[in-house]
């Protein structure tokens, strides 16, 4: 006898023998745990930033360079085994700082094509002026009331140093003064009267004579010093009169 229709197909049960149905709840949990583990591995705590001298107004750190969790329960694991400080005092590095730095770094500028410009023309350099090439100062001419030709005397006058002479080794330039024959005669006569010397008591008389002749006091003093040995010795030094008599003679000459 054959019995048909009593065999049940295996596929109708919905589950095949020897196969394990996939678990929908296990994969998200595994992926979440894997994600948390990867995130925890990226976070690192570096040197300790705790200020141990904050109460005194200073700044002192303990020198701990990296956080090491203390063995024990969860509360002890938040303390550093090296310095004993809480993990919050250590600098946290979650790996995002380097990524932010990469974003903040500007991109290198694009090179620009230089414009084809003509080469600049060389400019002529000014020739440096030598201090000795400056023209000398003109001769000092003294005014003369009677006129006549001027003769060069042996007296020398020290003029004010120019800027170029001061820059060139600080040398002073000496200038010769020219006198007329009338000026020389008057200076010779006055020098014989005062004895070829200038004394303090004759300063007013000397100033008056220099203003009358048109010669500066320093110039007359140098001239008298240069000609004292030659002219003064030949004339015997002259006879020196009193200042009152000299003033009276000068007043008479002016009248």
From Swiss-Prot:
Residues 172-235 bind DNA. It is found in: Nucleus. Disulfide bonds: none annotated. SUPFAM superfamilies: Homeodomain-like. It holds the Pfam family ZF-HD_dimer. Residues 21-35, 139-153, 240-255 have a biased composition (Low complexity). One of its GO terms (biological process) is regulation of DNA-templated transcription. The keyword Transcription regulation applies. NCBIfam families: homeo_ZF_HD, ZF_HD_prot_N. This is Zinc-finger homeodomain protein 6. The lineage of its organism: Eukaryota, Viridiplantae, Streptophyta, Embryophyta, Tracheophyta. The gene is ZHD6.
């Amino acid at each position: 006898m054959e019995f048909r229709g009593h065999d049940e197909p295996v596929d109708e049960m919905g589950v095949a023998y020897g196969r394990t149905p996939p678990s929908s709840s296990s994969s998200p949990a595994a992926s979440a745990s894997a994600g948390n583990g990867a995130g925890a591995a990226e976070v690192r705590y570096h040197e300790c930033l705790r200020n141990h001298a904050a109460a005194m107004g200073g700044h002192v750190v303990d020198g701990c360079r990296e956080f090491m969790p203390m063995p024990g329960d969860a509360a002890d694991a938040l303390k550093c085994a090296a310095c004993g400080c809480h993990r919050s005092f250590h600098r946290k590095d979650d790996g995002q700082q380097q990524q932010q730095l990469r974003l903040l770094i500007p991109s290198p500028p694009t090179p620009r094509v230089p414009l084809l410009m003509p080469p600049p023309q060389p400019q002529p350099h000014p020739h440096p002026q030598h201090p000795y090439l400056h023209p000398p100062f003109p001769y000092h001419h003294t005014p003369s009331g009677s006129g006549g030709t001027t003769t060069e005397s042996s007296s020398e006058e020290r003029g004010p140093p120019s800027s170029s002479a001061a820059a060139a080794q600080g040398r002073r330039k000496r200038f010769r003064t020219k006198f007329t024959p009338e000026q020389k005669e008057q200076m010779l006569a006055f020098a014989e009267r005062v004895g070829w010397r200038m004394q303090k008591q004759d300063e007013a008389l000397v100033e008056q004579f220099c203003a009358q002749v048109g010669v500066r006091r320093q110039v007359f003093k140098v001239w008298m010093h240069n000609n004292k040995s030659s002219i003064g010795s030949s004339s015997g030094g002259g006879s020196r009169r009193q200042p009152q008599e000299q003033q009276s003679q000068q007043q008479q000459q002016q009248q």
